[in-house]
Each structure stands twice: as structure tokens, then as C-alpha cells.
Amino acid sequence: MDFLPKEINDYCALYTQKEDDVLYQLHRETNQKILRPRMLSGHLQGQLLSFFSKMIQPDKILEIGTYTGYSAICLARGLKKGGELHTIDINEELEDFACSFIQKAGLKDCVKMHVGD
């Protein structure tokens, strides 16, 4: 997050849980293989989304803009048991990439991806 002062960013990084293996791999592969990797939510934003989702424990979430699935994974981890996250993206080229990481995260049953315009 380049918009935060370095001191605040460093503080957040120091006191935020480390990225798990799936999110780390997703972050890494997005930066290596995908055009415009800056669109990735990233670790600190993902942790904030996950925190809110776990606090609220929603039944349903609608995410507009899947990209490679990082934020979808973070949000879905806070769903109530049996809850669903519907994520919508226009880019068909990223569907398989995002779905593979959603599956690796063990969330394929609760994350429904919709692609197209």
C-alpha cells in the first residue's frame, strides 16, 4: 500500500498476521504471471477484509471485481457456516487462475464466480 506513510505501513506489517501459504503463493504468482499485478488487494488490505468478515460473519457477500481471487478468499474465510460469496468479474482470462486458488484455499463450495458482462 504505497499511499500510507512508511511508518504506518511498517507498523501494520509488524503487527499483522503473516500471509498463509495459499495467499502467499497467489500473491507471488499474480506478480509473476498476470498483467497489472498492482490490482491485487494484497496482504494488509486482505487482512482488513478478513477481519471485518470474521467480525460480522455474513451469510452472503457480493464482491464486484474478482481479479485473481485474493480478496474473495479473505472475505470468504469469515462467512457463516453454509454462507456464500458471489464474486463477479468481466475478465474471462483470469477465471481459471482465480478458481484454482479458491480451490487451494478450500473455499470452492462457498465461493461462486460469475464471469462476463
Residues covered by each model-derived region:
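N-terminal auxiliary segments of SAM/dcSAM-dependent transferases
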Residues: M1-D20
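Alpha-helix boundary/capping and short turn/kink residues
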Residues: Q17-D20, L35, P58, E84
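Conserved SAM-binding loop and adjacent beta-strand
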Residues: Q17-K18, I34-L48
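S-adenosylmethionine/decaboxylated-SAM
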Residues: H43-D117
